[in-house]
Curated annotation (Swiss-Prot):
Record-level Gene Ontology MF annotations: chromatin binding
Source species: Danio rerio
Disulfide bonds: none
Protein known as: MRN complex-interacting protein
Keyword entries, A-Z: DNA damage, DNA repair, Nucleus, Phosphoprotein
Bias (Basic and acidic residues): 90-100
Main location as per UniProt: nucleus
Locus of motif Nuclear localization signal (NLS): 142-145
Amino acid sequence: MVQEFNVLRCFSCQTFQVQQVKKAKKWTCKVCGEKQSLIKEFGRGAAADCRRHVQKLNALRGEQHQLNTQQLLAQGDEENENEDVYEVLDPKSEQEEAHVSRWSKYTDQTTEGPNEEKDDEDEDENVYTERPQFRIQGTRKRKKMSSLEPFGGNCDNYEESRAGYSQFRKQAYLPLQLEKRSSSSWNKGSVSKYSNCQRPDDVVPSARTKLPSSRQTVGHYPTACSSSTNTMENSIGNKQQIKSSYRPPTADVNKHLPIQSESPSVSSHQKFGESTIENKDSKWNKFLTIVPTQDKEEYYYESQNGKKTLIPYFTKADTVVDFEERRCPADEKDSGILNRQKVVGGNASCPTTRLPTKSVGFENAVCKPVLVKAPYSSLSLNPLFCTDEDFDDTS
């Protein structure tokens, strides 16, 4: 029996080929190797006849493929030539089409003419868009509107009225402020230490203030336990008044007391600028004598046993302050301090309290007996007073 062959075509590579006839309906392409089913036969017969037929079919397919490629190339060349010619002939038309806005189809070109476009261009040339000019113009307009709205007049009148109103308020406020300052400073009853720095109008009420007189301040002396409630200047003024008005009492014994000073110094009145004011109402003036040499500042005493040793001395400024601090208690005032002193062993002493050594110098000057040349005593020097007579205050 003779073997049969058939001519088939691959669906992927489109080539014709010879395949042996089989019972199965599946075959595989010898060129691309794609497995596919049998759909169409282009010939059946002997092997030699099938090969000649396949060669003819493939040759025809190749020629047709070349024609198709040539046609495609020819069409591409013609299109390129046409484009080049179009660009050379109409370059202006393309530029105009490119410059045309896409919004032109939505606008009415019939209403707009060439004259209107020229007018718009002229207006655009005269417009300035600088920011500083716009800011200045806007602020000026706003200021004018804000100034004209409240009063409805000119801007100058408004500013003048504002200036006058502000001056009136300042003038009305100044007297109130001065009254507050003056009332706060003078109601305290004391002159402030900053009174020299105030205005001349504020210093005027100082003449109306009532300051304590010298007689009122002399009535009470500061003690060690008393506390000062006044200001600094009042306390200094009271001390100066006490120093100037009070003079320590001296007994008749001072007539016989020789007071010597090797180096006389400036008196305390000249040193501190005080004035001597005597209390004429005192009942002790008839028993006291003022020695002109009491203005000497320092006192000293020399012993007579050949040793020149200095006994504690005092100053007149110290006697004024220390006298009240070192005196006897208040219950001994009725009969007088001098009445309570007694001579014990040639020295006077206070019966109730013993005075410290600092008060010795003070009472030595006040109640010192007549100094007699005698050997130096080992006893401490205490205030001495020779008489036991009581002073009658009623006389």
